[in-house]
Amino acid sequence: GCCSPWNCIQLRACPCCPN
C-alpha cells in the first residue's frame, strides 16, 4: 500500500510517509 517503505520512496506525497 501507499504506506509501505518502498512506496514511500516512490510516492512521497502519501500522508503517512516521512517528508
Swiss-Prot record:
GO molecular function: toxin activity
Intrachain S-S bonds: C2-C16, C3-C14, C8-C17
Record's keyword annotation contains Secreted: yes
Cellular component annotations (GO), alphabetically ordered: extracellular region
Modified-residue entries (4-hydroxyproline), positions: P5, P15, P18
Keyword Repeat recorded: no
Segments crossing the lipid bilayer: none
Subcellular location: Secreted
Tissue expression notes: Expressed by the venom duct.
Keywords (A to Z) from UniProt: Disulfide bond, Hydroxylation, Secreted, Toxin
Entry comment, domain topic: The cysteine framework is III (CC-C-C-CC).
Family stated for the protein in its record: Belongs to the conotoxin M superfamily.
Protein name (record): Conotoxin Reg12f
Native organism: Conus regius
